[in-house]
Amino acid sequence: MPNKIAPIPSPQNEPILGYLPNSNERKALKTELARRKSVIYDIPMFINGKEVRTNDTVDIFPPHELSHKIAHYHKGKTEHIHQAIDTALKARDKWANMHWEDRASIFLKAADLISGPYRAAINAATMLGQSKNVYQ
């Protein structure tokens, strides 16, 4: 049906979880925080769907705990910037020509994952990376 307009879901804020002592969300978050602090993550660049690593890395520390390295990322050079721009420009037309419903469904799927099975992981990463508390 080419003339059909897809229904747009009404926007709603996610419920604010209480993170009360012994609550499931608090246990999940504490587990995820401990897991993320126990690993040093290697963060490559992604260019044209491929992982790109360099010998030039930069360490990442939580702002509230500068003695604890949590990751390092691979620093790009001018050639990486040009490769990334070229790839993005090639993808732009494909994205622009995609039906808006398909583009919207990608963002809705991401929102479902972030608010569902990956909620504790996103919260833990944000808390460690930006020194936020669970309510921020």
Where are the regions a protein language model picked out?
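Hydrophobic face of amphipathic alpha-helices that form TPR/SEL1-like repeat modules
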Residues: 1-70, 90
